[in-house]
């Protein structure tokens, strides 16, 4: 007789886990040093003076008790200023695994197509919603214009040079956020 069992290991990851100021400062130092020593085109599109400004901006925005999402927001903002489409900040493996199991109520339910001055619903993940249908033009969300939302999100997306097409495509493919 063979008896087998299957146990599921409950993940100990929590997206609300807080990291100390010392932890995020140490990680930020490593992040900056790696970019400054090994990035082949750190100053192609952004001058050293400007990158120093953005690195300092990032340091100033580190605070005690940051979640991974809050820390990554600082890193993605600074990284986007390099203007290198091959340089980006990803979630930890644990966070990515958590995202694969997230419920609809905790994520933005719409897929949209974004270009110059328009944002259009391409899919609504909430099948019970009969208002936001495919093809609907979004002019604002929570009283913030779609163009203001796009401009804010652009600040966190890396791209080659000053190319905006990739940023529109990233938003249109549910990427990055």
Residue ranges and their predicted role:
Residues 2-5:
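C-terminal motif of bacterial Sec signal peptides marking the signal peptidase cleavage site
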Residues 7-177:
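Flexible, low-complexity junctional segments that flank or bridge functional domains
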């Amino acid at each position: 007789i063979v008896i087998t069992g299957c146990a599921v290991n409950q993940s100990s990851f929590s997206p609300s886990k807080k990291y100390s100021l010392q932890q995020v400062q140490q990680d930020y130092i490593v992040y900056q040093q790696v970019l400054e020593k090994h990035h082949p085109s750190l100053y192609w599109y952004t001058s050293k003076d400007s990158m120093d400004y953005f690195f300092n901006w990032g340091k100033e925005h580190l605070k005690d008790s940051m979640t991974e999402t809050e820390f990554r927001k600082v890193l993605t903002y600074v990284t986007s200023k390099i203007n290198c489409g091959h340089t980006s900040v990803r979630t930890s493996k644990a966070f990515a695994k958590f995202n694969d199991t997230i419920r609809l109520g905790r994520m933005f339910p719409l897929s949209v197509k974004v270009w110059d001055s328009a944002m259009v619903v391409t899919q609504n993940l909430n099948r019970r919603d009969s208002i936001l249908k495919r093809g609907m033009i979004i002019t604002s969300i929570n009283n913030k214009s779609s163009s203001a939302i796009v401009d804010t999100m652009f600040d966190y997306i890396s791209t080659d040079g000053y190319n905006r097409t990739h940023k529109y495509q990233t938003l249109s493919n549910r990427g990055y956020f």
